UniProtKB/Swiss-Prot annotation:
GO molecular function terms noted in the UniProt entry: protein homodimerization activity
Gene name for this UniProt entry: Chmp4c
Organism annotation: Mus musculus
Name of the protein this chain belongs to: Charged multivesicular body protein 4c
Domain-level remarks: The acidic C-terminus and the basic N-terminus are thought to render the protein in a closed, soluble and inactive conformation through an autoinhibitory intramolecular interaction. The open and active conformation, which enables membrane binding and oligomerization, is achieved by interaction with other cellular binding partners, probably including other ESCRT components.
Oligomer and partners: Probable core component of the endosomal sorting required for transport complex III (ESCRT-III). ESCRT-III components are thought to multimerize to form a flat lattice on the perimeter membrane of the endosome. Several assembly forms of ESCRT-III may exist that interact and act sequentially. Self-associates. Interacts with CHMP2A. Interacts with CHMP4A. Interacts with CHMP4B. Interacts with CHMP6. Interacts with VPS4A. Interacts with PDCD6IP; the interaction is direct.
Cellular location(s): Cytoplasm, Cytosol; Late endosome membrane; Midbody, Midbody ring
Biological process (GO), any one: mitotic metaphase chromosome alignment
Keywords: Coiled coil, Cytoplasm, Endosome, Membrane, Phosphoprotein, Protein transport, Transport
Cystine bridges: none
Region described as Intramolecular interaction with C-terminus: spans on this chain: 1-153
InterPro entries: Snf7_fam
Amino acid sequence: MSKLGKFFKGTRSSRARAAPSAQEALARLRETEEMLAKKQEYLENRIQRELALAKKHGSQNKRAALQALKRKKRFEKQLTQVDGTLSTIEFQREALENSHTNTEVLRNMGFAAKAMKAVHDNMDLNKIDDLMQDITEQQDIAQEISEAFSQRVQFADGFDEAELLAELEELEQEELNKKMTSLELPNVPSSSLPAQPSRKASMPSSVHRSRAASSRRAEEDDDFKQLAAWAT
């Protein structure tokens, strides 16, 4: 085995024996990102400087202009490599962050599951069923009590309500009959009618009697109307 292979094998073995924590690995990856970002900024500035030199010596010193363009190309190649490395580092950091998040979520879920199990260990399904049955029975009893209070109280007096209603109607009818009997009717004249005079002389007296009879009939009609209205 070559020395290089032994070196990497020993490195892998040492890492396996002492694996870094997720926080430590993330911290180192962020440091590497910062270093590569500074490298990018340096290379971009060098590229701009070499481009400016190439433009400056383009018409006066062609050899210096070509050397500036060569350096510019070399810096651009390095910048491309740094960009690729930085992308890989960012991807690795994001993957490690996701793995760390998933690990924390899984650990918290396991902790919650243990707590839930401890709670359920102190609970008996049979006791829960008995408790729910007791609650249902007490609710039914409370409902019956509420219905009993809301119903009308009826005393056992032994009287028939239909008979009482019939007796009440009889009393009302008797009272109505008494009121009708005590009602005063118009008096009928007891004197005999006068003898019929001769046709010629009795014309004014006949008209007078007709008017008196009409007045009595009107009074009688009024009395009967009042009686009928009272009776209804």
